[in-house]
Amino acid sequence: MLVFDAHLDISMNATEWNRDLTRPLEEIRNREALMLDKLDRGKGILTFEEMRKGEIGICIATQIGRYVALDNDLPGWHSPEIAWAQTQAQLAWYRTMEEAGQMVQITNRKQLNSHVELWQNNPADDLPIGYVLSLEGADSIITPAYLERAYAYGLRAIGPAHYGPGRYSPGTGSEGGLEPSARELLEEMQRLGI
């Protein structure tokens, strides 16, 4: 069987929570047992080993970098440029996992079909996890011109809104419609096929 997970904040778990997802789950939980910096420390459920056990061979893997304005008390980055840099750190982690054979990026139908065939015809024990790169909230897209760069590195999906106020669109817990800057963002997304 092959399971497709439609949303995993996998790079955030690694780069912001400092979780080595190549290690066993119990080891990660034990290492976090006395940590108090984040609400759900010691309760992680995701590792590459656990994904393979569950036959999760493909996922939508996110990048996330929320910008927060001065009047916003949510956690996030204090400028779109810092948020962009955070997403680039997450991208670097994905690339490192690719080099280690843990993951493989899927950017087109041919790669998808090949990866599905690999997982259907081999034991999952050591297979790479396929991922389609997504951006959760568009706050880190400094200007819509950055989308072309993002598409070139493999970004294939964007949810313009996430949680709270956003640069392009309000998210969960916020009211309002698309910001004026969202029109150009959406047009560029459509042009690129994101």
Regions found by a protein language model. Give the residues of each.
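Substrate-binding cleft of carbohydrate-active enzyme catalytic domains
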Residues: L186-I194
